[in-house]
Amino acid sequence: MKKIIVTGGLGFIGSNLVHMLIKKKFFVINIDKVSYASNFYNLKNLPKKNYKFIKLDICNKKKLQNILKLYKPKCIFNLAAETHVDRSIDGPKNFINSNIIGTFNLLECFREHIKNNHKSKLIHISTDEVYGDVLHGRSKESDAYIPSSPYAATKASSDHLVYS
């Protein structure tokens, strides 16, 4: 059974992704630090043979490295993030730690991981907030980033780390 890590799997999008992956017969390792955005109810009654929950902040690089070594995932979906715009204005430090430092740690661990697991993938999830206030139509991935909150700026920063 192929193993997939989902970071931020207790969030709204992450929990739906976990359900979909389990339906497709993957073994899912859900890494989540458990915060105001986490909801265990979204993942109740999951089959234990296909699912493992690990409470962990992706800012903890050493433990993250150990998990990648132990499970050797074929894919990592990074949905871990502080996501509340208003909270980012009141206290941007947590957003910088989680969205920038946490993503950097995950990238560093993944870089080490792919030395021995060449076919592994990392899929980083962003937000439309990086494009700022879109007045007409939809944003395209090729549009310029114009973040208008600390949340959007930290997500834009993490996107640039992934792109580089």
What residues fall within each predicted segment?
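N-terminal Rossmann-like NAD(P)+-binding domain of SDR-like oxidoreductases, especially those catalyzing
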Residues: M1-S164
